[in-house]
């Protein structure tokens, strides 16, 4: 089935809002013929779902779409940002407290990195917040070994190409020296794999600690390691209301598992 019925909501968006996966991953599920509408297997994401129609993914009914929720999580070093790891290493889900809804990470922090990781139950929101076009700055505190060349450090503001990969502008500032290590503040608007480590290595600095302090308007602040704190509904609406239409949600913020 691939016809697009008038009205209703795009099926990939509906699956993402139900917290099953991101919108892009939902489109992949559909083209892989793993999604059905009223019992008919779909092969195109260009389908709208009307109220009362039944959607299944891998034969299981689609969960009711929950109100959009966003959480701040203090990721510890040594946890993989993934649902499972083929090498058997601990993942962020092994460190999360019980009682949370099904959550997806916004972007990622590699296993050796720590600090602020946003989690959401809304796949569409996850995708929007990951896009560089959103314009949100990711800010990091970085400890790195090596001699700081201030001219090369400032040159990162023009972007850099490392091993054939082009990175956008990076703001890097030396805060202080601690023995043979430098503490820096680094800010960027995109999140390519291991970007901070690679651009600093490009200017002769080897990162040995990386802490994300902020993702857009959301700050790590004093949130303890492994703790999760929900972003209050009003703050969520104020900060991302222009990105997605969010229904009002009378709920109190929660903090869990400072562990």
Name every feature range the model reports, one short phrase each:
Residues 1-259:
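Basic, flexible Lys/Arg- and Gly-enriched helix-loop patches that mediate nucleic-acid binding at interfaces
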